């Protein structure tokens, strides 16, 4: 798709199973320490790069196992899924059970108003786990009806944190209202170098109310790779340990002070590793973030 066409050499032949390749492959050189961010409501720290799984499906089973097999060695822990993502929860649960890594992972999933206790039970069963680290109201569908039940599940230790999500600018006003009215540990919102709407209102409010932030669509559904095709990284990208456009886009996102973790989607092991490397090394300061924005905004000049 967008990134597959953009990244050179994507057709390398696999030797052996994807799982064996993932476990045996030489880890990429790490540029500096792992970047972690604090969850304001608890102080627990999370790696700043996780993985989104809305495109996880049966046809990508091998790649999913390979990515989750490598996740621990690369320092990642945050896995975001949803009851609405087809086979995603079941495939994640199967992989983590086989790998024996569930205890080290931070698993987030989502429900909607029509779900409730039965939907939570199904998610727990599919994920093969006794608890969910973060349960979110999917696209704000049922905030007022679900949150009281979620508070009860939190007391019962079926879930650890509560959140709400959106991936649409058109829902930002509704999200802001919920952030002001509801006791939340997390929000999840769309934000990228090309889509900065959340930075004007939602991210400052999250910082003010001490709410952790997961960022979805940091690549704008791969459109950023189309726009970057044929364009070199700026020379100063090396100053923040950036070696690819994916890392450029992700370091921009996670360097915002209010952002806790970005969750880029990936169903190719090479892309997953590239994304995870953005969670190490130096981050841009406010001045360099503005320079990144200017470089991106002037890409057609």
Predicted segments with their positions:
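Structured C-terminal cap/extension of enzyme domains
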Residues: 13-16, 201-301
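Conserved, mostly hydrophobic/aromatic
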Residues: 39, 51, 79, 92, ...
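Active-site mouth loops of central-metabolism enzymes
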Residues: 52-62, 108-115, 239
């Amino acid at each position: 798709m967008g990134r597959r066409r953009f990244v050179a050499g994507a057709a390398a032949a696999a030797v052996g199973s994807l799982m064996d390749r993932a476990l045996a492959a030489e880890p990429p050189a790490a540029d500096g320490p792992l970047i972690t961010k604090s969850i304001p409501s608890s102080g627990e720290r999370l790696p700043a790069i996780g993985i989104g799984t809305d495109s996880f499906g049966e046809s990508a089973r091998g790649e999913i196992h390979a990515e989750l097999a490598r996740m621990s060695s690369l320092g990642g822990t945050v896995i975001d899924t949803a009851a609405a993502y087809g086979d995603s929860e079941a495939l994640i649960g199967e992989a983590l059970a086989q790998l024996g890594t569930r205890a080290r992972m931070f698993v987030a999933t989502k429900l909607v108003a029509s779900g409730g206790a039965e939907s939570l039970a199904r998610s727990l069963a599919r994920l093969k786990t006794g608890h969910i680290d973060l349960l979110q109201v999917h696209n704000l569908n049922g905030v007022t009806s679900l949150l009281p039940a979620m508070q009860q599940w939190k007391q019962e230790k079926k879930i650890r944190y509560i959140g709400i999500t959106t991936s649409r600018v058109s829902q930002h006003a509704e999200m802001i209202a919920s952030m002001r009215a509801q006791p939340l540990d997390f929000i999840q919102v769309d934000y990228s170098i090309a889509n900065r709407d959340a930075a004007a209102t939602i991210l400052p409010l999250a910082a003010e109310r001490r709410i952790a932030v997961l960022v979805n669509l940091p690549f704008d559904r791969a459109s950023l790779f189309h726009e970057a095709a044929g364009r070199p990284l700026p020379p100063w990208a090396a100053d923040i340990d950036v070696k690819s456009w994916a890392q450029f886009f992700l370091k921009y996102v996670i360097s915002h002070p209010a952002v806790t973790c970005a969750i880029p989607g990936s169903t190719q092991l090479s892309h997953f590793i590239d994304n995870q490397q953005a969670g190490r090394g130096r981050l841009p300061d406010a001045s360099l973030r503005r320079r990144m924005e200017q470089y991106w905004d002037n890409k057609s000049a």
